[in-house]
Amino acid sequence: MQIRISVRHGTLSEEAQARITAKVEKLGRLFERLVDIELMVDLERRDEPIVDLRVSAEHKHDFAATHRSNDLMGAVDQVVHKLEQQLRRYKQKIQEHHRSA
């Protein structure tokens, strides 16, 4: 699983990047078929950063979430939570499909 973090209109500290990477890696434990994770932080408005998270899984399944908050780590937490919900729903859908077959 490849994780990419990019920043627009600013930079992140090494500590912030490490914390974000640790939070995003948890998605891989939730759903093992993830191939690529891309997180983009837009710091154009420093008081309200925008966090955009895009996840690609096997068989061309893509998931995405965006959140704007007045706190960077709060926005990261929210966007990861949104993706966790999407992945749980998708995983449940797959499991139910295989049970009915």
Stretch-by-stretch model annotation:
Residues M1-A101:
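N-terminal, polar/charged subdomain of small-to-medium soluble alpha/beta proteins
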